[in-house]
Amino acid sequence: MHEQPLSRKSLLRLAGLTAASLGTGAWKAREAFGGGPAAVESGAVSCVLTPEMTEGPYYIAGEKLRRNITDGHAGTPLVLQLAVVDASTCKPIKGATVDIWHADAAGNYSGFGAGSGSRTFMRGIQRTNVRGIATFRTVYPGWYQGRTVHIHVKVHLKGNVVHTGQLSRTP
């Protein structure tokens, strides 16, 4: 599948219990069929699973259930909508818990390093709605040495971690 670079306002999807890349075909299917099961039934797109990735050194368990995770930090606004769907049917999964965390616009993680202050900025949890969507208000993550800009994701179902991954933009 040809991968299309993600813009700041891109809808990022989690396919099955893992992150999915949205290629050119998926974008066309989304326009024509609205994405999700209708797009899959059309044959224009299927659920594509990505490999598990490390949670990295900056995970803090027990984050707050909240939509706005900025804690007032400045940066380019980003509304991140993640869809959790069944890998076999591409149908939405209601009630999954999506946990995200990332660096602030300056490339700093909350809870780590001198001057990080609050342990909660750019960290939060949302449950998916009936359409399988979890929405977060955040800022576009900043870059730091040795890594591409990315957002960490964990998906939980019935108390179990079913996916750990990272969302990033390809050059």
What do these predicted ranges mean?
Residues M1-S10, A15-G23:
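N-terminal secretory signal peptides
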Residues A39-P171:
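Beta-strand-dominated extracellular/periplasmic modules and repeats
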Residues K28-P37:
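Signal peptide processing junction and immediate N-terminal pro/mature segment
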Residues A19-A26, A105, L157:
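A generic secondary-structure signal for well-formed alpha-helical elements
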